[in-house]
From Swiss-Prot:
Bilayer-crossing regions: 126-146
Gene that encodes the chain: xanA
The protein, known as: Isonitrile hydratase-like protein xanA
Active site as annotated: C131
CDD domains: GATase1_PfpI_2
Presence of keyword Cytoplasm: no
Localization per record: Membrane
């Protein structure tokens, strides 16, 4: 007699910082909030529980949207093992350059998350970067010998940046322009790495992640609800 498998739920940490690109973090959140076991928009049994994380209680995104965050960085660090997924959005290059150069606590949070042991042996945690958020992941020293993507204008800069960060002898990442890349489990760390290119491609990557953690049918359902034409692995 077959039994129904238990429902799975995932806790998501969405890392924010001043000047963050709006769609980089709101697009994954939109996809995740539509993911429910019962597909009931009025009373959803949501698969993903989302928490925004930042160094301050409020974050101004692109000087256009003020977000009240759920957790401060230090509180998130204390409860980091509770999370299954970390979303790392991007921002304008000048902002990311300045942020990375300051050796921020955000980088330590990313590194700590990526090196946590899996919650279950058969399902690693997921580190999901969008656009120039890959530079924060790179600053954590995690992009060694893996395939990644980022905004098309930042491809060469990310490769050069990681070579500097990783140092001599370390394998550089293979950086190419695709809608998203699932690199599998990191060579440095224990998390599964998913990277998305510029801005709107994170919709495709988010739907892909949902298909991996739930089902392809669920992602197709969400794309219909969102009236979005889900794109696959496009190189241009």
């Amino acid at each position: 007699m077959s039994s129904t498998p238990p429902k799975k739920y995932y806790k998501v940490a969405v890392l924010l910082f001043e000047g963050v690109d709006i769609l980089d973090f709101t697009a994954p959140m939109e996809v995740f909030t539509h993911t429910s076991h019962n597909r009931n928009p009025d009373n959803p049994d949501r698969v993903f529980q989302i928490n925004t994380i930042a160094r301050s209680r409020t974050v101004n995104a692109k000087k256009a949207l003020t977000v009240q965050t759920d957790l401060l960085l230090e509180d998130a660090m204390q409860g980091l093992a509770d999370f299954d997924i970390m979303v790392v959005p991007g921002g304008p290059p000048s902002l990311l350059n300045a942020l990375v150069a300051s050796n921020p606590r955000e980088v330590e949070l990313i590194r700590s998350f990526a090196t946590l042991p899996p919650k279950t042996p058969d399902e690693p945690r997921v580190l999901f970067s969008i656009c120039t958020g890959a530079f924060l992941v790179g600053a954590a020293g995690l992009l060694t010998g893996v395939s990644v993507t980022t905004h098309h204008r930042a491809i060469e800069k990310l490769r050069e940046f990681c070579i500097r960060v990783n140092g001599e002898g370390a394998s550089p990442p293979e950086v190419s322009h695709k809608r998203y890349i699932d690199a599998g489990v990191l060579k440095v760390g224990s998390a599964r790495l998913l990277t998305a290119a510029g801005v709107s491609s994170c919709l495709d990557a988010s739907l892909y992640l949902v298909s991996q953690l739930t089902s392809l049918d669920m992602s197709a359902f969400i794309s219909r609800v969102m009236e979005y034409d889900w794109k696959g692995q496009l190189s241009e």
